[in-house]
């Protein structure tokens, strides 16, 4: 399609990233660990590095992806950790929005509609900004991202095999990393 040039994709992705950064600006300018990011994920992972920490339960479930992210991010210098936690949460929401721009979705909706949906995902206010700025709430963008990847139409041509393998790897990671995938996977399949 004419609208879907590589330059257009890059500009839209950049615009989505800027919109997401504007939304998270207060947390980026005055970094602090939100809620359980500090009380649980930072406190449990900063003092020592233990791979077993990725299986530590939180709020009645085991968020493997969040635990792994916190474990790795807590190896950074202490002043960078709050910003790194916010950026990790932002990357997950950016992944959701970016998935809608992939060429496979042209079978579902025109490019302009998908661009509007991607911007809407990062601009429309949810209950709070915690979904965009807190690792403790990262299961929600992870769940949405997994759902979008599972619902993504398969491409008719085989020339993008590496892309499909990467997509499958991301689906497997998100399914393992997110405890809510047990509820979501049957809906997407």
Predicted regions and their residues:
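Membrane-interface junctions at the ends of membrane-embedded or membrane-associated helices
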Residues: 1-6, 153-166, 189
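Membrane-proximal lumenal/periplasmic loop motifs of glycosylation machinery
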Residues: 26-34, 47-75, 79-89
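Membrane-interface alpha helices of multi-pass inner-membrane proteins
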Residues: 163-187
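Juxtamembrane "helix-exit" motif on the non-cytosolic side of transmembrane helices
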Residues: 26, 73, 99-105, 123-134
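Membrane-interface micro-motifs in multi-pass membrane enzymes
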Residues: 92, 109-155, 176-177
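Transmembrane-helix motifs of polytopic, lipid-linked glycan transferases
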Residues: 87-110
